[in-house]
A protein has these predicted regions:
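Aromatic-acidic/polar surface patches that form glycan- and anion
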Residues: 30, 68, 72, 175
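Active-site neighborhood of thiol-dependent amide/isopeptide-bond enzymes
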Residues: 47-107
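Generic ordered-secondary-structure signal
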Residues: 19-22, 34, 38, 55, ...
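His-Asp-centered catalytic microenvironments across diverse enzyme cores
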Residues: 96, 104-185
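Loop/turn elements at helix/coil->beta-strand transitions in domains of secreted/extracellular proteins
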Residues: 29-35, 85-91, 108-114
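Secondary-structure boundary elements
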Residues: 1-67
């Protein structure tokens, strides 16, 4: 017997497809899908040391159902996989200097086609007109774009300047393209 608990059509995260469907429910545009995946992941994860030091929490189904806590690489890998299979192939993880997070490839033909969506630190960095999230390459060239944001959201113990997260972006950041989707509960 495998009991399932789904309340008000929420929490059916037992398969990758069901998790992705719930996380993008209500999206009317591609940009909505990007924001909803980011929002649903960050709302349901806690920044905490993982139980396992390996890649076990990189699977979105395991991360959301079993662990619920993570460090940046776990959230980044799971988020990148959701973006990739959610209609954004070419999405990637950006390995900054001390942080890892996903960039959704929203529009491959646009100047800012990639959007750095930091699930772990509850932030994304908007262009100067505050219209669209930027990719890490732009932020690496202009750290002020990251300094304007409050990382870890509005609920923090004390205000901390965003200088440290901004300094993580550099022109020599690395990349990975995780697309893991294998576990079912």
């Amino acid at each position: 017997v495998n009991p399932r608990l789904v309340i008000n059509d929420r929490g059916n995260w037992y398969t990758f497809d069901a998790l992705l469907e719930e996380f993008t429910r209500g999206a009317q545009t591609r940009q909505d899908r990007v924001y909803l995946i980011w929002e649903n992941m960050r709302r349901n994860l806690y920044h905490e040391s993982p139980l396992f030091a390996d890649n076990t929490p990189h699977d979105p189904v395991r991360l959301m159902n079993i662990f619920g806590s993570n460090l940046c690489d776990d959230a980044g890998n799971a988020g990148c996989s959701l973006y990739h299979h959610g209609g954004f192939p070419g999405s990637r993880n950006r390995a900054l200097h001390g942080h890892v997070q996903c960039e959704a490839l929203v529009d491959p033909d646009a100047e800012f086609g990639l959007q750095f969506m930091d699930i772990d630190m509850d932030a994304f960095y908007l262009d100067r007109e505050n219209e669209l999230p930027l990719d890490g390459d732009v932020i690496a060239q202009d750290h002020d774009l990251a300094r304007r944001e409050l990382n870890y959201g509005p609920e923090v113990n004390a205000f901390k300047a965003s200088d440290a997260p901004a300094a993580l972006f550099r022109p020599d950041d690395g990349y990975a393209h995780p697309t893991l989707r294998c576990h079912e509960i």
